[in-house]
């Protein structure tokens, strides 16, 4: 799987991509069971990105790896993940299997995120960005951090922090809209 050479890494592959690939190889050389991948393919060209994602998936199967894959690119998340957690201002607002989350998002922030992902089957659709300014993570709003931008916000959302609760087996959301009336 790996080979070592006296050639310095910068001569094998140039720039950021080469050094990132060498870092990945070094991380795998110790045969980990768990690997944190923070924006692991963000700086890569789309064609290289696809190859690296396929490599990640192959290695997951061959080496029985578990990844914590952190990414802002939802198409990458959908492609590589079995489960997804969506965060807003440092708090998990939804957790579900990848298939469930992308098919039927529950939390208003997750819905807004997925609504902004361009899709071929919705080419003629007008995309409306989430309204309002993103609050500062250093001084987040009271209550639900998403309430200033949420179209469903109530006074309860402004005053109380919703807890991440199971809404179905293997699925959790932090939203007061899930409470039964």
Q: Language-model features: where?
A:
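Short catalytic/signature loops enriched in Gly
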Residues: 97-181
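Conserved ABC ATPase nucleotide-binding domain "signature" region
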Residues: 19-20, 50, 135
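P-loop NTP-binding/switch modules centered on Walker-like glycine-rich loops
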Residues: 36-44, 48-126
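Single conserved hydrophobic/aromatic residue that forms the stacking wall/gate
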Residues: 1-18, 23
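A generic local structural motif
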Residues: 7-10, 54-56, 131, 160-162
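Conserved Q-loop
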Residues: 15, 77-79, 143
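Conserved catalytic motifs of ABC-family nucleotide-binding domains
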Residues: 31
